[in-house]
Regions:
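Iron-sulfur-associated redox domains of electron-transfer enzymes in respiratory
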Residues: 2-159
Length: 159
């Protein structure tokens, strides 16, 4: 094997390990306007550590998160998606979080059918006063995704 080919071979065979070593998961968070978004705001005001790679999308209700948006986020490069809403029984729109829970269950099944680990999707109930809990949930989810590695779907698609 020539020196140039050897270097190229080493580069290619070690690239995956190198990338995962410094892997910072990209997480998209769909946060309920009435509870979870306010918890994120409170976490920031209290200087609670949250993943720097968390991209927040404010939605009026967790029950209004379109499954197509979740799938699109994963296909376009998100390593994980968090849907966070009010605790059951506390929804500003009465039953929105129950809709979210049903959609979440179906979405997880769909992801598994497509060959993607459904643990890349998380549903959490976080009230407006739970800034610390917001930090805990997002950091635990980021660690879970970090252990899973990069989203394999983003490598297979070219959107």
């Amino acid at each position: 094997m020539k020196a140039a080919e050897s270097t190229k071979h080493k580069f290619n065979s070690n690239w995956g390990a190198f990338m995962e070593e410094g892997f910072t998961p990209k997480i998209v968070g769909f946060l309920c306007n009435w509870c979870s978004y306010n918890a994120a705001d409170l976490a920031g005001a209290a200087k609670v550590e949250v993943p720097s790679s968390l991209s927040v999308i404010r939605v009026m209700c967790s029950g209004r998160v379109d499954p197509v948006l979740v799938a699109t986020a994963l296909l376009r490069g998100a390593d994980g998606v968090l849907i966070a809403g009010c605790h059951p029984g506390d929804c500003h729109y009465r039953e929105g979080n129950y809709y979210a829970r049903r959609r979440f269950t179906l979405l997880k099944e769909t992801l598994e059918t497509l060959g993607l680990d459904s643990n890349r999707l998380m549903l959490a109930w976080i009230s407006a006063s739970e800034g610390r809990r917001f930090g805990e949930v997002t950091n635990e989810f980021a660690q879970q995704i970090r252990e899973m590695g990069p989203n394999p779907m983003k490598q297979k698609t070219s959107l």
